[in-house]
Structures are given as C-alpha cells and as structure tokens.
Amino acid sequence: MGGESRYQIKIPSNQINIKNYYCSNSYSNPTLATPSLNPYFVTGFSDAEASFIILILKEPKNKTNWTVKTRFSIGLHKKDTLILELIKSYFGGVGTISPQNKESVQYRVGSLKDLNDKIIPHFDKYPLISKKQADFILFKKIINLMNHKEHLTLEGLQKILAIKGSLNLGLSDEIKTNFPNIRSMERPLVARPKINEIYPNWISGFTSGEGCFHVRIKNSTKSKLGVQVSLLFKITQQERDK
C-alpha cells in the first residue's frame, strides 16, 4: 500500500528582506542596530497580510449616536512577532503590538495622526498592487472625511457609511437596520500590474506572507530507495487576485 508524507514550510521570520537587499540573521545580535525594511517589502507583506479597517460603533454620548474608529492592522502567529516589530520600526515606532489570542499577535495603528503621518504616505508612495489597493483607496477617503471632522455630523457619517459599504465585509446588519437608505459607493477598479511594476522586494514581502514551500515524500516502486521526493513552491490567494 502506498504512503505519502507532506511537509509545509513557511518562510521564517529571520529570513526577511532588509534594506540592504540581503536576507539576514544578524539582527538577533543585540549589539547590532535594528535593520530597516525595504519599502517595497513592507508593501508586498501588506498586500499579503494587512487590513484597512473602519469600525462604526454605537456611542450615545456623541451627537450622531455613533463613533468611527480607524485601524491599519497586521496579524501573525506569535512566532513571527519579530516581523511586526520590524514593521513597527519602519513606520517610526507608531502603533502597538499586542496578543490577539494564545497563538497570534497583531500590530495596530489607530490614531488619525499616525495614519496620516506614516501609513497613508507610505502606501501613496509605494502602492499596493493586489485588489487590496481598492480597500486602501476607500480607507483613505474615510480618513480624509474624518480629517475634516465630517464623522461628527450625521451627513458626514452617512458619507462614511456609503464608502464603508464597499470596504472589506461591508456594513453590519445593525448598521443596515439603523441606516436602511445607505447606498454603497462603487468599489474602485484596480488595474492589473505590469510585470515591470512588480519589484523583487515586493515579491519577497508578499512571499513572506503568503508563500509556502512543500516537501512531499511518497512510496514509489520506480525509485531505488522506494520513495519519491517532490518539491513545491506555492502562493495561495483569493479568487479576485489570481
């Protein structure tokens, strides 16, 4: 009877691409300066793992009875906390890293100032190339409304809800019940990137988030050793980004 074993290897956190374009383990030496990530690595990793989140929550103390919260976040397994620390360092130390549960940690940037000063300028200069770029565009529109205090008025809140309707999972059932006349804004179209627009460091960052290296071992009568070894590199994505 034939048998098969599979081994899946995710890229370890100590093999990330730093600014000098080399993979390095040297940062583990506490006497050395912390390396800085290449900007395109950060964008590639964000295309794979980041989320642009808008939360609309009940808040009776506000004139609109609602509050708007913003968040840029990246969640990873706790063994990869180092990557989040390097990303936080890249963004000038803004945001927090905290446990989500026993096995995962999350990097969050929530303040408008930090989003305006660090997060948005980065993705304006080094844009996302997956369909997540549409989420960023919508997120940025909401941030701009909040910069002008429009989230504090009912009219402004309704504008935000129309945008959020096309962001991530859209509007919650609670929001739809309270704002039944909101019509979601059309989701921005993101052009397919040209090959020469995909930089090596973006590929490195994206692969660090989504890439897997598989080793498959199965019994084989054609091999002198009685087994056959196959190697596979794989990147998995949602249908919209294939």
Predicted regions mapped to residue ranges:
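Sequence-level preference for short, compositionally simple segments enriched
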Residues: 1-242
